[in-house]
């Protein structure tokens, strides 16, 4: 398996784009792995020095500029550490104004109002400079409709569907589990730990002396309910210790308060993790739930069908990226002001 690097990701992107006929006709959504992008939904509060003066366009432009810089400066080192790069290689690529409050009250358009306290809610996406520089050699900037971190996009869409303030989303990969936190409208990557599909297949290799392909086939047989009750019970006992390591990883990232954790595995996860028997293993009040596409298709009234030739490896992440476009802020003028102010940060 090739190394998961900027160079290899760009090679794969180039091959994929070559398959799209009349590429120039389309807008592209970049939904990126946490290694290459970090999207944060948050807010910045500012105090106006002259609260009795009416807010005009120049004033709001200045406030947005202050908020963007303050947020960028506050998060740059943390984002760099998360993506394992130097802070000078953190690029701010996509800023959206999601809302504004004046003295604690939501306002669609602040121009013409007076206020002392201004709170600006936005989403900001940071990317690895080398990745973005390489991608712009493949596509013009105008071709890109949205850049987002996959896990945060999923958390945002799920928060819209569930209308809930607090939960975790966990993306499960071959070697790692990445956890995203939704907390009262604030969304971001929370943390990661080393556990994934390979831990399960290596376990079965140690116990049963079988190769990875056979191990995956056994898990599929068990997960699909095609095994005998006796085999399933013995198989779960074999998996128990390794799945406990997964549970411990989740607990290490959680506080001691009730929390639902929606699992989004990029492989077939043994369904026993969703049973009350497995959930009782937690020392903290955590509950594991499957991240079903029905959570969003039924809520938003979509009926999803793909061509037989389409190869979609993770449907929820695909739909989340698509739906993010639908939930972009309607006040494009505010986001335009924001992106105009970040140009000096993206070069």
PLM feature spans:
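Generic beta-strand/beta-sheet core signal
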Residues: 31, 182, 269-271, 291, ...
């Amino acid at each position: 398996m090739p190394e998961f690097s900027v160079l290899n990701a760009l090679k794969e992107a180039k091959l994929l784009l070559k398959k799209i006929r009349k590429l120039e006709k389309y807008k592209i959504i970049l939904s990126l792995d946490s290694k290459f992008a970090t999207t944060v939904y948050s807010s910045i509060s500012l105090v106006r020095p002259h609260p009795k003066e009416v807010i005009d366009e120049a004033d709001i432009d200045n406030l947005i500029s202050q908020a963007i810089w303050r947020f960028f400066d506050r998060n740059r080192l943390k984002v760099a550490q998360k993506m394992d790069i130097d802070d000078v290689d953190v690029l701010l690529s996509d800023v959206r104004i999601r809302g504004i409050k004046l003295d604690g009250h939501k306002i669609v358009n602040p121009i013409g109002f007076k206020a002392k306290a201004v709170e600006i809610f936005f989403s900001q996406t940071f990317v690895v400079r080398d990745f973005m520089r390489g991608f712009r050699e493949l596509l013009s900037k105008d071709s890109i409709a949205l850049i987002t971190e996959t896990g945060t996009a999923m958390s945002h869409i799920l928060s819209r569907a569930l209308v809930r303030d607090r939960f975790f989303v966990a993306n499960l990969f071959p070697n790692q589990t990445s956890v995203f936190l939704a907390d009262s409208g604030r969304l971001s990557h929370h943390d990661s730990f080393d556990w994934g599909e390979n831990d399960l297949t290596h376990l079965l290799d140690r116990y049963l002396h079988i190769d990875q392909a056979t191990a995956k086939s056994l898990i599929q047989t068990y997960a699909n309910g095609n095994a005998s009750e006796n085999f399933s019970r013995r198989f779960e006992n074999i998996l128990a210790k390794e799945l406990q390591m997964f549970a411990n990883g989740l607990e290490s990232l959680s506080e001691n308060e009730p929390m639902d954790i929606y699992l989004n595995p990029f492989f077939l996860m043994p369904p026993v993790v969703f049973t009350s028997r497995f959930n009782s293993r937690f020392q903290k009040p955590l509950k594991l739930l499957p991240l079903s596409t029905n959570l969003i298709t039924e809520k938003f009234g979509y009926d999803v069908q793909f061509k037989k030739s389409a190869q979609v490896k993770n449907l929820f992440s695909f739909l989340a990226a698509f739906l993010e476009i639908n939930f972009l802020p309607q006040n494009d003028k505010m986001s335009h002001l924001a992106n105009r102010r970040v140009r000096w940060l993206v070069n």
